[in-house]
Amino acid sequence: MRLSLCLLTILVVCCYEANGQTLAGQVCQALQDVTITFLLNPEEELKRELEEFDAPPEAVEANLKVKRCINKIMYGDRLSMGTSLVFIMLKCDVKVWLQINFPRGRWFSEIN
């Protein structure tokens, strides 16, 4: 798969502890939105989302350049990648919920 490094990088960012107030594995909603937009939605929508973060124009253009390459992949393949990412993000969020609500529970060990 050509995008394996790109997808692995997204997963690392998704499952990395963003700050001291979030638990490791909790996926930021904004990151989820941008990631799915990056894979599946039109370039114009990605540009709007990136501009919400006040990113430098060079960074926005670099992302759009990669997006143009991604858009050359068949939509069905991109949809499969997006589906896989959604399942992984959901698993990360479920782990966090279980850690919070069942800190010593057997459920957490079952999904590791």
UniProtKB/Swiss-Prot annotation:
It comes from the Eukaryota. Residues 1-20 form the signal peptide. It is found in: Secreted. One of its GO terms (molecular function) is steroid binding. Linked by three disulfide bonds to C3. The modification Pyrrolidone carboxylic acid is found at residue 21. Its main location: secreted. The heterodimer can bind non-polar steroids, cholesterol and a group of small proline-rich peptides. Belongs to the secretoglobin family. Lipophilin subfamily. This is Prostatic steroid-binding protein C2. The gene is Psbpc2.
